[in-house]
């Protein structure tokens, strides 16, 4: 049994009483009803497809009500992350983001991409920004092609981070040269999040 299968087997079930009797949900499906999406783990094409589908579904359910994404991710594939990013910007509902644990690399970009004023981090979470990673091997001409693609992606990611943080392109380029780790409060000062939440506000005790 691989780690993914083990993780799926550990997902709790929630049982609700309805007029037709009991109905069981896995915890993530139940929270999706409250417009909560969990972006947890490495960002790959499968995760991107699932998150994009959830965003589009919630938009169809109510295009005027906020969607909340909780992020605990080490990052992952740039194109997969940008699929989520583009969908967040495309749909009508405001998308709030909250970092729990860590938001690194593409996870940090998606955290910053939440609706302005609705981007949060919990106090002990960590945020890390850096440039896209290379490592392609092959013929020299192919390596050159991939190197140019990485530079193109880096330029675009820097533009996105600058847009959402308010930092200059020069600052973003300098600060992403190497892995750049930040505490929740440092991420707030940098413009990656708007507020560090130590407790849920009293008026929003219910899920969502």
Swiss-Prot record:
One GO cellular component term noted in the UniProt record for this chain: endopeptidase Clp complex
EC numbers for this chain: 3.4.21.92
Highest taxon above the source species: Bacteria
Keyword Methyltransferase: no
Positions annotated as active site in the UniProt record: 105 (nucleophile), 130
InterPro entries named among the record's database cross-references: ClpP, ClpP/crotonase-like_dom_sf, ClpP/TepA, ClpP_His_AS, ClpP_Ser_AS
CDD domains: S14_ClpP_2
Residues in coiled coil: none
Catalytic function, reaction form: Hydrolysis of proteins to small peptides in the presence of ATP and magnesium. alpha-casein is the usual test substrate. In the absence of ATP, only oligopeptides shorter than five residues are hydrolyzed (such as succinyl-Leu-Tyr-|-NHMec, and Leu-Tyr-Leu-|-Tyr-Trp, in which cleavage of the -Tyr-|-Leu- and -Tyr-|-Trp bonds also occurs)
One Pfam match: CLP_protease
The keyword NADP appears for this protein: no
BP-aspect Gene Ontology terms: protein quality control for misfolded or incompletely synthesized proteins
PANTHER family given in the database record: ATP-DEPENDENT CLP PROTEASE PROTEOLYTIC SUBUNIT
Complex formation: Fourteen ClpP subunits assemble into 2 heptameric rings which stack back to back to give a disk-like structure with a central cavity, resembling the structure of eukaryotic proteasomes.
Record-linked HAMAP family: ClpP
Job of this protein: Cleaves peptides in various proteins in a process that requires ATP hydrolysis. Has a chymotrypsin-like activity. Plays a major role in the degradation of misfolded proteins.
Family: Belongs to the peptidase S14 family.
Protein name (Swiss-Prot/TrEMBL): ATP-dependent Clp protease proteolytic subunit
């Amino acid at each position: 049994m691989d780690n993914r299968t083990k993780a799926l087997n550990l997902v709790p079930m929630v049982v609700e009483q309805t007029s037709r009797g009991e109905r069981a949900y896995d915890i993530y499906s139940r929270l999706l009803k409250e417009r909560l999406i969990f972006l947890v783990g490495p960002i790959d094409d499968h995760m991107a497809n699932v998150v994009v589908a959830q965003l589009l579904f919630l938009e169809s359910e109510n295009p005027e009500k906020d969607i909340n994404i909780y992020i605990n991710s080490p990052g992952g594939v740039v194109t997969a992350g940008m699929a989520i990013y583009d969908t967040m910007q495309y749909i009508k509902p405001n998308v709030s983001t909250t970092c729990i644990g860590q938001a690194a690399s593409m996870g940090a970009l998606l955290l910053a991409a939440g609706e302005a004023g609705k981007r949060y981090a919990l106090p002990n979470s960590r945020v890390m920004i850096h440039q896209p990673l290379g490592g392609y091997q092959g013929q020299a001409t192919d390596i050159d092609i991939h190197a140019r693609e990485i530079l193109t992606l880096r330029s675009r990611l820097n533009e996105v981070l600058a847009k959402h943080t308010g930092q200059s392109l020069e600052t973003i380029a300098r600060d992403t040269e190497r892995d750049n780790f930040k505490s929740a409060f440092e991420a707030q000062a940098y413009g990656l999040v708007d507020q560090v939440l130590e407790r849920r506000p009293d008026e929003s005790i219910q899920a969502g």
